[in-house]
Amino acid sequence: MTLSLANYLAADSAAEALRRDVRAGLTAAPKSLPPKWFYDAVGSDLFDQITRLPEYYPTRTEAQILRTRSAEIIAAAGADTLVELGSGTSEKTRMLLDAMRDAELLRRFIPFDVDAGVLRSAGAAIGAEYPGIEIDAVCGDFEEHLGKIPHVGRRLVVFLGSTIGNLTPAPRAEFLSTLADTLQPGDSLLLGTDLVKDTGRLVRAYDDAAGVTAAFNRNVLAVVNRELSADFDLDAFEHVAKWNSDEERIEMWLRARTAQHVRVAALDLEVDFAAGEEMLTEVSCKFRPENVVAELAEAGLRQTHWWTDPAGDFGLSLAVR
């Protein structure tokens, strides 16, 4: 096993991005905070709990598809290199790596993430499980550094978990177009998309009975409090999940239970919340199969294969340029 890590992020890039995002979001109308700030250590643990909840079907459904279709996916892709946009520590990653190993194709794993620590631990774990594998980790930002992913071998780039749904249509189109530009002849993209379904099931997946998603949502306030010396009262905000039928997306909001005055000392910023005012913290767009094909085509990609679960809850696309 060989392990390399290329880091394209400045040491203070995360701190600067947080400052920029919080100032922009808290001075906008409606107020908002980007979902990437959910994921400190506490938030990551809460999200791991969410993926195991009975109401939260996406993770287990995507895993079910991969469990039954990984060999087929790898046969179609013919890849010797797995590029994962994300941490590379999940069960789903291993299903694909196992299929590549079983097909005697596996040579290389390239995890891409914003967190160098996550990349090191993921790389070490994968290296221990797959002797002889070459690991070329890339620490970077999706918006800036996709072009830094090494052009080596025949690559299968995977973007799972319907993370693509956290992008609204314009940024999503830009992301897919940029990603398409990085693909060379012989490369493939495996894209996970959560599909439009019964509204009740969708809302429950983001508003579970145990309140884990509510704690996850409020945790973004704890991150701002800790990192930017703010004084949000977490208990003064309630979690709200709703279906936006026009945009076909779930939205997560934090609603002020009473009027609030919040100071963010590190930004020298003070903001007021009216009682009942809602702040947007996440969108999770859902897809129709024909729209997935169209969005890929718009980015210059051709869907060659489509896999879904028996209930049609979740879809995996294999696409090429």
Curated annotation (Swiss-Prot):
Amino-acid positions noted as binding S-adenosyl-L-methionine in the UniProt annotation, renumbered to this chain: G86, K92, D113, D141, F142
Mutant phenotype after disruption: Cells lacking this gene are unable to synthesize ergothioneine (ERG), but do not show growth defect. Deletion of egtD from wild-type M.smegmatis and a mycothiol (MSH)-deficient mutant does not affect their susceptibility to tested antibiotics. The ERG- and MSH-deficient double mutant is significantly more sensitive to peroxide than either of the single mutants lacking either ERG or MSH, suggesting that both thiols play a role in protecting M.smegmatis against oxidative stress and that ERG is able to partly compensate for the loss of MSH.
Reactions accelerated catalytically: L-histidine + 3 S-adenosyl-L-methionine = hercynine + 3 S-adenosyl-L-homocysteine + 3 H(+)
Claim: Membrane is one of the keywords in the record: no
Annotated positions binding L-histidine: Y56, N166, Y206, E282, V283, S284
Keyword Methyltransferase among record annotations: yes
GO biological process, one term: ergothioneine biosynthesis from histidine via gamma-glutamyl-hercynylcysteine sulfoxide
Keyword annotations from UniProtKB, A to Z: Methyltransferase, S-adenosyl-L-methionine, Transferase
Pfam families linked: Methyltransf_33
InterPro entries listed in its UniProt record: EgtD (IPR035094), EgtD_Actinobacteria (IPR032888), EgtD_Methyltrsf_superfamily (IPR051128), MeTrfase_dom (IPR019257), MeTrfase_EgtD-like (IPR017804), SAM-dependent_MTases_sf (IPR029063)
Pathway linked to the protein: Amino-acid biosynthesis; ergothioneine biosynthesis
Gene Ontology terms for molecular function: L-histidine N(alpha)-methyltransferase activity; protein methyltransferase activity
Enzyme Commission number: 2.1.1.44
Known role: Catalyzes the SAM-dependent triple methylation of the alpha-amino group of histidine to form hercynine, a step in the biosynthesis pathway of ergothioneine. Among all the proteinogenic amino acids, only L-histidine is a substrate.
Domain notes: Consists of two distinct domains: a typical methyltransferase domain and a unique substrate binding domain.
Similarity section: Belongs to the methyltransferase superfamily. EgtD family.
Quaternary structure (record): Monomer.
Protein name: Histidine N-alpha-methyltransferase
Gene: egtD
